Amino acid sequence: LGEFESSECIWEDVIETLPRGELRDFLSELNESTVKVALKPQYVDHIPKAFKGNVGKLLSSVNERGLYDEMIKKFGLGHLLERNLDQLSGGELQRVAICATLLKKADVYFFDEPSSYLDIYERMRIVRIIQELSESARVIVIEHDLAVLDVIADLTHIVYGKKGAFGIFTPARTTRKAINAYIEGYLVEQNLSLIHI
């Protein structure tokens, strides 16, 4: 917050600048370590390096919500339970990763590119499952597939910047407006062309 001499961010100062609302409440909870986040990572191919064993062992180890059997059925994973993670295709790993995330008990579920590696039928199944979750929990999805984004999200932030340098989140807008702004390559409220970034 402009205090360049200080090497650490003081959360209370950041929170104080925000208007009362959901973001302020969330950051307060995060600051107080009362928020638990479940993350589906972007790079599912790293999962077999981090966890040795089979699909059933992984999923049962994260079954905090007691939904193991229901999720196995929803994701069509029954035939994969005895298979080692390093033997799975990209799409199978993606489904296992999303299932594992949903089995965790969390306040916020974060899905980084949940549609990659999946065919259109699997993408739509994942969309329905994530939408169902969003009725009872906070859900954040990072997605580059505009068709999936159009179906899965109510509100969308466009994020732009330079890798390793800076990133800016636009204010939330309806998904349709966000997609149109992205396709047009121009953000009216920032008077910014996305083409040159």
Question: Model-derived features: where do they sit?
Answer:
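Conserved small/polar residues in nucleotide/adenosyl-binding loops
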Residues: 196-197
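Hydrophobic/aromatic position at a conserved helix-loop-beta junction
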Residues: 102-104, 134
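Conserved beta-strand-loop-alpha-helix hinge in the C-terminal portion
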Residues: 158-193
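Catalytic Walker B motif of ABC-type/P-loop ATPase nucleotide-binding domains
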Residues: 109-113, 118
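Hydrophobic anchor residue at the start of the ABC signature
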Residues: 97-98, 126
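Conserved H-loop
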Residues: 132, 145-151
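Conserved catalytic loops of ABC-family nucleotide-binding domains
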Residues: 129-141
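ABC-family P-loop ATPase nucleotide-binding domains
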Residues: 8-93, 104
